[in-house]
């Protein structure tokens, strides 16, 4: 049998999952100062995550995104949700 080079990704939950989401918070903010001072007064979305690793150790992660970055992030999550609904 000849392999075409295309493979659908397969996720083995036990070996691939690196953490479990414990908490998810977000806020909309407005940048009023910047080290580079190139673009002030722009809106951004801040996302704060609490994640537990395989041993139960909880760590916090935060991400700041511009509005276009957040819109792309949101679009990708909608695509994930659509795929999940077909399973």
From Swiss-Prot:
Superkingdom field: Eukaryota
N-acetylmethionine, modified sites: 1
InterPro entries given in the database record: COMM (IPR017920), COMMD4/6/7/8 (IPR047155)
GO molecular function: NF-kappaB binding
Compartments where found: Nucleus; Cytoplasm
Pfam family, one: COMM_domain
COMM domain: residues covered: 20-87
Oligomeric and partner information: Component of the commander complex consisting of the CCC subcomplex and the retriever subcomplex. Component of the CCC (COMMD/CCDC22/CCDC93) subcomplex consisting of COMMD1, COMMD2, COMMD3, COMMD4, COMMD5, COMMD6, COMMD7, COMMD8, COMMD9, COMMD10, CCDC22 and CCDC93; within the complex forms a heterodimer with COMMD1. May form a homodimer with isoform 1. Interacts with RELA, RELB, NFKB1/p105. Does not interact with NFKBIB. Interacts with CCDC22, CCDC93, SCNN1B, CUL4A.
Family membership: Belongs to the COMM domain-containing protein 6 family.
Listed name of the protein: COMM domain-containing protein 6
Gene that produces this protein: Commd6
């Amino acid at each position: 049998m000849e392999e075409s080079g295309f493979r659908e990704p397969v996720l083995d939950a036990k070996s691939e999952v690196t953490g479990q989401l414990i908490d998810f918070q977000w806020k909309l903010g407005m940048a009023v100062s910047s080290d580079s001072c190139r673009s002030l007064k722009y809106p951004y979305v801040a996302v704060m995550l609490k994640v537990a690793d395989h041993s139960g150790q909880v760590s916090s992660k935060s991400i700041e995104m511009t509005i276009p970055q957040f819109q792309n992030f949101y679009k990708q999550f909608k695509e994930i949700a659509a795929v999940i609904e077909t399973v």
